[in-house]
Swiss-Prot record:
Residues 200-394 form the GMPS ATP-PPase domain. Residues 3-199 form the Glutamine amidotransferase type-1 domain. It is an enzyme of class 6 (ligase). One of its GO terms (molecular function) is GMP synthase activity. The keyword ATP-binding applies. One of its GO terms (cellular component) is cytosol. Homodimer. This is GMP synthase [glutamine-hydrolyzing].
Length: 528
């Protein structure tokens, strides 16, 4: 199978870059700059990502770049540098990189001045092209052995270079973002130059992952952390397909679930997937430990530690359990700061209960069969495993549950309030036939009360916020319905108006409803 190694220097777009390459049916994997070269030298191509580093203000060229380019000198294995990746390549080939010079952010027009294999059948000399830039440093002069393919119209700075003989290419812009219209075609050309075969599919992933699970587990037993969501359901189905009754599924009722969730889990796993499940009610334990806790990171840590403690109790009832299966996916690892080959150089956004919330004393070895997949890939995998569309299209639900949708202190009363409001909202979205055209929708309960009037009397109740977003892979998101057609927009506005009335009239304790229109970034999809 063809494979592309992406060296991640901390770009916010690295995960998107990996996803775009997979869209071309070529497997890509992300590695930190401190990876040992021997672990990655068997790939078909290298890509050096962008990132916040500055060549003029750094301690020199990273060792991994030296290793890759020395290997390229012997083998001509293709190398692509993007943004900072271009700058570090240029510096290696004796070009000057200047800090805070010719900055460019956003849409930029290029003048194409020379033909190259990297732009074949896309652009040609004399064309102008639209791309997306995000850089403060610039390559000042032409790297040794390279030719300039394009300059920026804005300031005549170097935007694209090529060394055709050694098959090394550099782009100051970001071909991986959707704002570079021809970006996917440029990546496809680079992968064609590398001779990559389009042989990565979900079907091949299933076969490979089953073999990997069997090899990792041997004759031991696995206890599975089920949530009832898409990720853990698909992970359980894949693992069960690989090892059968060696998998023991446990569903913990933590008291922070969606309305009637336990019954839905029974229907899903026992009736549809035919996978045995042990259901354990520990809602009182979770709510007691979360009493008076308001900090979202502490909530996540407490929930993660409590989950593991309970799983260890359940595992002790079985013999030979050494592994814990989780439905961790790529964005979970990214937002938690990551671990291993896909760790980020960026800051931690939030701890994911499957990743950053796990206690260091955890006794289990982890089985995470989906940790290299994005959400849409997980759904494709689920369809190939025979899981129904209704299950696969369930909106994402956070591992810590309603704990991160109740801002501030958590009480049983607030949980019931939020469950009722969320159930009303989701059912109305389904009534208006909008559920399947959005990525995620939910209600957030705020820690503030507002004055209202009901039945000629003053009320003083909680405010809640409705949220709905569209996304492709969970890495970025747009507020719904502003990205949709006019008919869908009006339908949704009627829906949230009806939801507001229904929540206020039906849910005791809520007297005001607002709507969140913030995109990701700058916000995350969840509030905590």
């Amino acid at each position: 199978m063809s494979k592309v190694a992406i060296i991640d220097f901390g770009s916010q777009f690295t995960q998107l870059l990996a996803r775009r390459i997979r869209d071309l049916n070529i497997y890509s994997e992300i590695f930190l700059p401190n990876v040992a070269f021997d672990l990655i030298k068997g790939v078909d191509a290298f890509i050096l990502s962008g990132g916040p580093r500055s060549v003029p203000n750094s301690d020199g060229i990273p060792k991994i770049v030296h290793d890759i380019l020395q290997f390229n000198e012997k083998t001509s294995i293709p190398v692509l540098g993007i943004c900072y990746g271009l700058q570090i390549l240029s510096n290696y080939f004796e070009s000057d990189v200047v800090s805070n010079c010719n900055k460019e952010f956003g849409k930029t027009i290029l003048n194409i001045i020379k033909n190259s294999k990297i732009i074949e059948n896309i652009w040609e000399s004399g064309d102008q092209a639209c791309v997306w830039m995000s850089h403060a440093d610039s390559v000042y002069n032409i790297p040794r052995g390279f030719e300039v393919i394009a300059y920026s119209v804005l300031n005549n700075s170097i935007a694209m270079v090529a060394n055709e003989q050694r098959r090394i290419y550099g782009m100051q812009f970001h071909p991986e973002v959707y704002h570079t219209p021809d970006g996917i075609n440029l990546l496809a050309n680079f992968l064609d130059i590398a001779g990559c075969q389009k042989d990565w599919t979900v079907t091949s992933f299933i076969d490979d992952q089953q073999d990997a699970i069997k090899k990792q587990i041997g004759n031991k037993k696995v206890i599975a952390a089920l949530s009832g969501g898409v990720d853990s359901s698909v992970a359980a189905a894949l693992t069960y397909k690989a090892i059968g009754d060696q998998l023991h599924c446990v569903f913990i009722d933590n008291g922070l679930l969606r309305y009637n969730e336990v019954e839905k889990v029974k229907q899903l796993f026992i009736n549809e997937l035919k996978i045995p499940v042990t259901i354990v009610d520990k809602s009182a334990v979770f709510l007691n430990r979360l009493k008076s806790i308001t900090d979202p990171e502490r909530k996540r840590k407490i929930i993660g530690e409590t989950f593991i403690e309970i799983f260890e109790e359940e595992a002790n009832k079985l013999e030979g359990v050494e592994f814990l299966m989780q439905g961790t996916i790529y964005p979970d690892v990214v937002e938690s700061g990551g671990s291993g080959s896909i760790a980020k150089e960026s800051v931690v956004i939030k701890s994911h209960h499957n990743v950053g919330g796990l206690p260091k004393t955890m006794k289990f070895k982890l089985v995470e069969p989906l940790k290299y997949l994005f959400k849409d890939e997980v759904r494709i995998l689920g369809r190939n495993l025979g899981i129904s569309t209704e299950i696969l299209m369930r909106h994402p639900f956070p591992g810590p549950g309603l704990a991160v949708r109740i801002i501030g202190e958590i009480t049983e009363e607030k949980v019931k309030m939020l469950q009722a409001a969320d159930d009303i909202y989701i059912n109305l979205i389904k009534k208006y036939e909008l559920y399947d055209v959005m990525w995620q929708a939910f209600v957030v309960l705020l820690p503030v009360k507002t004055v209202g009037v009901m039945g000629d009397r003053r009320t003083y109740g909680h405010a809640c916020v409705l949220r709905a977003v569209n996304s492709h892979d969970g890495m970025t998101a747009e507020s719904f319905p502003f990205c949709m057609d006019e008919e869908t927009q009006w339908k949704f506005f009627k829906c949230i108006q009806e939801a507001s009335n229904a929540i206020i009239n039906s849910v005791n304790g809520i007297n005001r409803v607002a709507y969140d229109i913030t995109s990701k970034p700058p916000a995350t999809i969840e509030w905590e």
